[in-house]
Amino acid sequence: MSDITRIAVVGLGLIGKRHANILCRTPGVELSGVVEQSEGGQQEARRLGVPVFASLDELLSNGGSDGIILATPTPLHVDQGLACIAHECPVLIEKPIAVTAGEAKLLTDAAAAA
């Protein structure tokens, strides 16, 4: 087992960039990749020297991350969070975790059952 914890960031908007930059400066942590569609976000990932994935599914299939930070728009959190849980990949979801309380419960129930 490696002494380095590999964390990926999904979404390189304002918050995602903050997460990515902090991860790059944290001892014992490696920014293992990003998922980003925008050209600006892809340029930022290249500047950071990390792989860019076209989708969360591609990132999860790669298997190169010990955890994922979801810094995407709130309406995407439930599907993305459930995908991470299904792949048994620890996930930090930026707040709010869902649009409705029912969606949030769906996520927390899935995490508790995992």
Language-model region placement:
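Intrinsic low-complexity, intrinsically disordered segments enriched in polar/basic residues
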Residues: 1-2, 64, 113
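Short helix-capping segments at alpha-helix termini
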Residues: 27-28, 87, 112-114
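Beta-loop-alpha module in the N-terminal Rossmann-like domain of NAD(P)-dependent dehydrogenases
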Residues: 50-110
